[in-house]
Amino acid sequence: MPSRPRIVSVLLPQPLPEPFDYELPETLNAGPGSFVTVSLGPREVTGVVWAERATPSNRKLKPVQDVIGAPGLSANMRSFIERAAKYICAPSGMVLAMAMRSREALDEPPVETLVVRTGDTPPRMTPAREQALAQATEPMSGAELARKAGVSPGVVKGLLEAGALMHVERSLDPPFPLPDPALPAKQLTGEQAETSAYLRGMVREATFRAALLDGVTGSGKTEVYFEAIAEALQDPEAQVLVLLPEIALTQAVTSRFEDRFGVAPAEWHSAAGSSARRRVWREVAAGRARIVVGARSALFLPFAKLRLIIVDEEHDQSYKQEDGVLYHARDLAVLRASVEQCAIILASATPSLETLHNAQAGKYVHLRLHARPGVATLPQIALADMRVEPPETGRWIGPQLAGAIEQTLAAKEQALLFLNRRGYAPLVICRACGERLKAPDTDSWLVEHRYTGRLVCHLTGFTMEKPLACPHCGARGSLTGVGPGVERLAEEVHTRFRGARVEILSSDTVASADDLRSLIARMETGAIDILIGTQIVAKGHNFPTLTLVGVVDADAGLRGGDLRAGERTFQLLLQVAGRAGRADRPGRAIIQTYAPESPAIALLAAGDRDAFIAHELDQRRLVGFPPYGRLGAVILSAPTAEQVDDAARMLSEGQPNAAGIDVWGPAPAPITILRGRHRRRFLVRSDRNVDLSSFLAAWKERVKLPSAVRMTLDVEPYSFM
């Protein structure tokens, strides 16, 4: 009697809602988690066996083509993918695609062929052979051995034939060196030691626990969570994931890991090359990469035994992915820790209100570090009211900040000027006709970058040379930049503080990790007097002689209708101000503002974080916004305004009735046209006890939209553009 064919469900990294069934030939062996190649229409694609079906199918099924020898996805990883997909209202296949984004990782790493001694003596020994064997102290290529020994390649070939040497293969992806948790740590203060002891105990429990590590800038949060990492590494199979919000911060923190654990961690971020990603992915899957430091996408690596997750700077909005699959890495990190039954530490000097609320509700343990170690003190913060003391026409630095810069330079100390606008000018207009230059097919202003002589759309990446004449009216020489960017600020600084060594730190001026390391080294050694930067300067860089921080336009983040505008402004300015003063040098921050009475600005200057948090929570509670409710966004786009408006009407009419849910819209998105597509938005608010994800998914299922219309669901949106 013929054996019953095995049926496997294969999830594909495609925008598909569920796995497809395939027949597994008797010649192949695969189980849940195995990577396989299958046919999808005319194409051959790679997927993952999601389950094995006990009942045969009545349909003729395509066979699995092949089984790939890469380490499979664990049951925990598959569960995480399914639960994450449900939470963020995305097809499971698209979440799987994030776990498979390094396609080359599924291939066996390339190998090199080397020669080594066997220990046997050749029957005939010559001086040349003797020389070659004497040099063969470690594996190397035959050509390298011949060169090193000063003999011909034929001598090496003869030793191989005689059995005195043999070929061995070595992977070009070597294992990562093992970290040593027993290396001596920095001396901790009493407060730090008490906090680290609690975290160590939490890790030892080997179950899901979450802690908020809430410490002022410079309080030693990194040193404290290092001890939790050391505790996790006592288990020789344990792995640790440290998430960081920026590639820049990944580079800055690597040396600190080396100092504590003797080796650099494995790094995972978009700047890594394909071979580096292959190496990290496979070593993580095999359980040999013990500490992984990475950006948000590292969350989707296939860890074999994840025992601790750390989300550093957990408040940072760059943890929210705003294109492709929309998710917040902090929220999914908590979900992954729950699935893996491991500890998670959320660290920040300015925690998000959502995380603080969870700590207040007892879901997370709240651990606080109140002081900087040693004699270091927090910087003094002063407000410069620009309504009272405005800068001169055409300038952006007011008299109070200018005087402080002069004092700082005279004391041979460093200043940091913060302006969160890239480029030279955020807007280019024609003086003749008033036209504002926009990106093609997009409601987004073009930003002037004078260093490159180009106009850039920071939303779509469109770039063009600055035209000599206005494209609208043809007037020559009429285009002018309006408002300051970091390049324009640098121009003013060069003019006003002659002789000062000035550099800009932004994503435009730092093209690579090496560029960033070089700039940071110059700052650390005092080769820069004034550093001008965007928000990248707020993240984790400590400069010993930086004593002055100047915020050029504190009000920029308060403009617009973003519900988190005040929170984000407070967090960012507190982080930036915290760069000033370390060791025995007291720091100060001067914040230029036209709205000193704004709660975010006034309470920042007063140093009263708790009062600001209470104020923001009160405002959110009144309207049921996060953390007291949940938000979702539905974004529709289509080639024409008529198409998107028709789709919005269809969606409105198909809205399910549900208690505890409010729907606002449709309304034109603030960026009404993006890449030639017209956009409309709905905003959905739900009570905390309502399953918002299920509501959004059900709403999407109820309405069949035309193929020209795209619908995007965003759970807990951070951008309302």
Language-model segments: residues:
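Walker B catalytic acidic pair
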Residues: A295-R296, D312-E314, R421, T534, ...
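Accessory, non-ATPase domains that flank or precede helicase/AAA+ motor cores in DNA-metabolism machines
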Residues: M1-S348, T355, Q360-A376, L409-A410, ...
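Conserved P-loop NTPase nucleotide-binding/switch module
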Residues: F303-L332, R336-S338, A349-T350, R431, ...
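Flexible beta-alpha connector loops of hexameric P-loop NTPases
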Residues: P71, P265-S274, D316-Y327, R387-R395, ...
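Conserved interdomain linker/interface between the two RecA-like ATPase lobes of SF2 helicase motors
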Residues: L335-A347, S352-R431
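Accessory helical-bundle/CTD segments and flexible terminal tails appended to RecA-like ATPase motors
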Residues: R101-D120, A382, R387, G434-R436, ...
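Cys/His-rich short segments
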Residues: L401, Q407-R496
